[in-house]
């Protein structure tokens, strides 16, 4: 559940604030199979691994998006953003609070992203997106929702989080990394094979 409110104090600067809440349970959890697997894995890190059966999180969130040189028009009293020839810079901060609404997760996440779609002519576009993220505080979180590992390559916009795919990560750890880098480049053209 994401509850966000946004405001645009000046042209091109969007500030979004809200909370993100997740309730997740491990499907088909079998204590014996998991224990046997960990025993067979032997010593080292996997021997001491504690996998939770529930991930409940409550996280206040702040997102700042800035697009310099944003063009817009007014539709009555409503401002309609059209686009810009400059890239959009995004800074996203989230902090999970343990004990609020039954959350058992405490984390802190910071992400930075730059994205732009460049019109080459009337029907061709070149888009790019580059960013990185870091968990500055982790409590067995391991990127459980795969949010940062999918490609969103939708012609309507880069911000469509429904489309795309995600890459499967190592089956033992999901992703225990504290940071990630990502980059996408897309060239869109009709009749590209003709």
Annotate each language-model stretch with its function.
Residues 1, 50, 92-193:
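C-terminal outer-membrane beta-barrel translocator/porin domains of Gram-negative envelope proteins
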Residues 1-120:
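Transmembrane beta-strand segments of outer-membrane beta-barrel domains in Gram-negative
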């Amino acid at each position: 559940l994401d509850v966000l409110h946004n405001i645009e104090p000046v042209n091109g600067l969007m500030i979004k604030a809200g909370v993100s809440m997740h309730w997740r349970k491990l499907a088909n959890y079998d204590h014996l199979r998991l224990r046997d697997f960990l025993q067979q894995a032997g010593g080292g890190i996997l021997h001491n691994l504690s996998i939770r059966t529930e991930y409940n999180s409550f996280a206040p969130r702040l997102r700042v998006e800035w697009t310099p040189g944003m063009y817009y028009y007014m539709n009555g009293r409503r401002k309609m953003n059209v686009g810009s020839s400059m890239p959009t810079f995004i800074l996203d901060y989230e902090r999970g609070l343990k004990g609020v609404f039954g959350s058992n997760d405490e984390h802190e996440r910071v992400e930075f992203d730059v994205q732009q779609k460049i019109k080459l002519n009337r029907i061709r576009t070149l888009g790019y997106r580059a960013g990185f993220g870091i968990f500055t505080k982790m409590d067995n979180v391991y990127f459980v929702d795969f949010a940062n590992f999918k490609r969103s390559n939708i012609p309507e916009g880069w911000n469509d989080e429904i489309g795309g795919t995600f890459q499967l990560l190592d089956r033992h750890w999901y992703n225990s990394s504290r940071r990630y880098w990502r980059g996408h480049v897309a060239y869109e053209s009709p009749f590209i094979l003709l």
